[in-house]
């Protein structure tokens, strides 16, 4: 897989209070492409950040229905990946991709 494809798999780091707490357990949370699979996510993180990944868990957050000036709209679904790193490995997501 090329580096360009790796950048298509990982959209952005998810920086929330919950993901900050997960970093204490050697886990990093990323927003990923909806069609990305666990092996693709693992390969992309290992290639882009030069770390060893021991596990990948994924979830899909369904978009909410929102109203703006009487018009009903819907937010997009978001797929997140919780990546567990090997002992001694770390990624500083604050610096960006």
Swiss-Prot record:
Protein name, UniProt field: Large ribosomal subunit protein uL23
This protein's record includes keyword Ribonucleoprotein: yes
Entry's Gene Ontology BP terms: translation
GO molecular function annotations of the record: rRNA binding; structural constituent of ribosome
Keyword set includes Ribonucleoprotein: yes
Keywords, comma-separated and alphabetical: Ribonucleoprotein, Ribosomal protein, RNA-binding, rRNA-binding
Species this protein is from: Chelativorans sp. (strain BNC1)
UniProt family annotation: Belongs to the universal ribosomal protein uL23 family.
InterPro entries: Nucleotide-bd_a/b_plait_sf, Ribosomal_uL23-like, Ribosomal_uL23/eL15/eS24_sf
Described purpose of this protein according to its UniProt entry: One of the early assembly proteins it binds 23S rRNA. One of the proteins that surrounds the polypeptide exit tunnel on the outside of the ribosome. Forms the main docking site for trigger factor binding to the ribosome.
Quaternary organization: Part of the 50S ribosomal subunit. Contacts protein L29, and trigger factor when it is bound to the ribosome.
Any Pfam family hit: Ribosomal_L23
Gene Ontology CC annotations of this record: ribonucleoprotein complex; ribosome
Superkingdom assignment: Bacteria
């Amino acid at each position: 897989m090329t580096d360009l494809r790796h950048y298509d798999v990982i959209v952005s780091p998810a920086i929330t209070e919950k993901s900050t707490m997960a970093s204490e357990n050697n886990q990093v949370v990323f927003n990923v492409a909806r069609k990305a699979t666990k092996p693709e996510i693992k390969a992309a993180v290992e290639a882009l950040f030069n770390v060893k990944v021991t596990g990948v868990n994924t979830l899909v957050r369904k978009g909410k229905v929102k109203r703006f000036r009487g018009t009903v709209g819907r937010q997009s679904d978001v797929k997140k990946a919780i990546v567990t790193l090997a002992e001694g490995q770390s990624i500083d997501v604050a610096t960006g991709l």
